[in-house]
Amino acid sequence: MKQLFRKWHTLSELKKELTNRNWFPATSGNISIKVSHEPLTFLISASGKDKTKTTPDDFLLVDHQGNPVLETELRPSAETILHTHIYNHTNAGCVLHVHTTDNNVITNLYEKEVMIRNQEIIKALNIWEEGATIHIPIIENYAHIPLLGEAFKKHIQSDCGAVLIRNHGITVWGKDSFDAKKRLEAYEFLFQFHIKLLSIQGGVSSGANSYS
């Protein structure tokens, strides 16, 4: 029980930090943190809650299928299936899904992925190669959640990663809450930089990687 309370506090503090950046507009987004590995349980944000408020009903404990462990009237977030896929296929400890203007704009510029290279902050992703290039996959925003989950699952390849959903934010995961937040901050910085650079250069050149 002590572990559950400790994880709850960590997730609540993380929610406050991300809320202060306006990364949960209009109740959007969801976050989770692993509580136990065997059996797999994790805390996830409840659906439809105003994340600018802190209440006892902010999160609920769910199992490996995303079903509530304890009796509750709360509903887990609609995208819980994305979190279950990550926890079931990796050793990740925290998953963050946020909607920002920049990550939505990026998904309207490119079709299958966005490629960014030679930025110092890429090292925050534990990539130390000089002049490194990263590729962030983009999937379609399928209304049918199981279909969205299947498209998403194809890009779960390690204990840390990120997937953009067209017009539906980014999902980032890492080994723990610190790692996941650091990665999310890095991606959002890179998206903001990329969009600003394109605005100076005159936009995305037409080609295979141009969605507009």
From Swiss-Prot:
EC assignment: 4.2.1.109
Entry keyword set: Amino-acid biosynthesis, Lyase, Metal-binding, Methionine biosynthesis, Zinc
Annotated cofactor note: Binds 1 zinc ion per subunit.
Annotated disulfide bonds: none
Spans through the membrane: none
Binding residues annotated for Zn(2+), in chain numbering: H97, H99
One GO molecular-function entry: zinc ion binding
Top-level class of the enzyme under EC nomenclature: lyase
Swiss-Prot/TrEMBL catalytic activity: 5-(methylsulfanyl)-D-ribulose 1-phosphate = 5-methylsulfanyl-2,3-dioxopentyl phosphate + H2O
GO biological process, one term: L-methionine salvage from methylthioadenosine
Gene Ontology, cellular component aspect: cytoplasm
Complex and partners: Homotetramer.
Functional summary from the UniProt entry: Catalyzes the dehydration of methylthioribulose-1-phosphate (MTRu-1-P) into 2,3-diketo-5-methylthiopentyl-1-phosphate (DK-MTP-1-P).
Protein name according to UniProt: Methylthioribulose-1-phosphate dehydratase
Native source organism of the sequence: Bacillus cytotoxicus (strain DSM 22905 / CIP 110041 / 391-98 / NVH 391-98)
Organism taxonomic ancestry: Bacteria, Bacillati, Bacillota, Bacilli, Bacillales
Gene: mtnB
